[in-house]
Amino acid sequence: MVALGFHISYWDGLGWKDPFSSQSSTDRQRTYARLLEIGQVYTPQIIVDGSREMVGSDRAKVLAALHDARAEAMVPVTFAADRRSVTIGAGDARGSVLLVRFALERTTRVARGENARRTLQDANAVESLSSLGSWEGSPLRFAIEPPAAGEGIAVLVQAADGRMLGAAKLQ
């Protein structure tokens, strides 16, 4: 299981800019809204396996979705011992292979806005998302740069309909 925080940017104009927010994360959320036929974007939102969405504060729904996700078969994603390559195993689907770089832990002091004078603790906050290429169902290997100190990386295999086919992280 790989948990990542894609911080959206549409609240940035309300007195404080989230240092992890990005337009690409906002676009990703809007793509999920379209694919999952939600109709609108909102926060806090959790997407599980690219196929289920729920309000992030609904603990019972989140735990049920995570339990169901663990039972599903995934395409193997494994990192080499030297941390410089990742292999996507064989499977019956096709998808995009994505590389995510994220901050393991960060503390942010909020100066203004709704959370003024609060200190926020973030874990696995996405810093960048890039494409490694396409996966057509056959085993495939990609060269990668290992994570820097305080950083993690995740490799996701995602179908065109948004479903996660495989994932792994390296810290």
Model-derived features with residue positions:
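Ligand-binding face of N-terminal immunoglobulin V-set domains in extracellular IgSF glycoproteins
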Residues: 46
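Conserved helix-turn-beta segment immediately C-terminal to the redox Cys motif
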Residues: 1-6
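Residues that line or immediately flank small-molecule/substrate-binding pockets and catalytic motifs
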Residues: 8, 50
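A short acidic, helix-capping loop that chelates divalent metal ions and anchors anionic groups
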Residues: 11-16
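Short, conserved sequence motifs used for protein processing/export or organelle targeting and
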Residues: 17-42, 51-171
